[in-house]
């Protein structure tokens, strides 16, 4: 949902992370890792390889400038699932090939071909198989009829804060309600 580093609420600037690595090395840190959280629920096959390239280049730069022993790079999540009918699902094989390509182009020539890569693909792996179960907790009849549920903006802040797409409705038969 966010994909501009200047808008990210987490993390450090390039200058800050370089300084942080230097400080940590001076205090005795021997191994380092890099982690990113830049976007959520991207529905493009290009995002993850692009993020990998940025992080891999950052890792090489940090190794060269600070001498840090970078053991892992966590690409975080971000690979989304289609919520809207007009959205195509991501091609996880194309994404994997893209990440492998930049790994081999950036990290391997820099002598960093042993850096572990981590991902956090919970939404991609589990999202299509889950369901939201909610309970009607009150009814309001004014000019229209409303049903209040226990899964509203107070309970589900992502749609309210980031404009995430709402869930689809499953229509139940009368005897199932």
Where do the PLM segments sit?
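Structural preference for beta-strand elements that scaffold enzyme active sites
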Residues: 31-35, 72-74, 116-118, 146-148
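Flexible, glycine/charged-enriched surface loops at secondary-structure junctions
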Residues: 65-72, 109-118
């Amino acid at each position: 949902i966010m994909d501009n580093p200047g808008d990210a609420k987490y993390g450090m600037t390039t200058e800050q992370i370089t300084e942080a690595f230097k400080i940590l090395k001076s205090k005795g840190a021997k191994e380092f890792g890099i982690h990113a959280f830049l976007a959520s629920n991207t529905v493009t096959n290009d995002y993850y390889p692009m993020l990998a390239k940025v992080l891999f280049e950052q890792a090489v730069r940090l190794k060269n400038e600070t001498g840090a022993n970078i053991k892992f790079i966590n690409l975080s999540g971000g690979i989304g699932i289609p919520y809207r009918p007009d959205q195509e699902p991501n091609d996880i094989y194309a994404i994997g090939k893209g990440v492998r390509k930049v790994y081999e182009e950036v990290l391997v020539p820099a002598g960093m071909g042993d850096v572990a890569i981590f991902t956090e693909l919970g939404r991609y792996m589990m999202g299509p198989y889950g369901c939201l179960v909610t309970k009607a907790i009150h009814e309001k009849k004014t000019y229209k009829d409303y049903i209040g549920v226990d899964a509203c903006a107070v309970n589900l802040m992502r749609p309210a804060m980031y404009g995430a797409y709402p869930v689809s409705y499953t229509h139940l038969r009368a005897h199932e309600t």
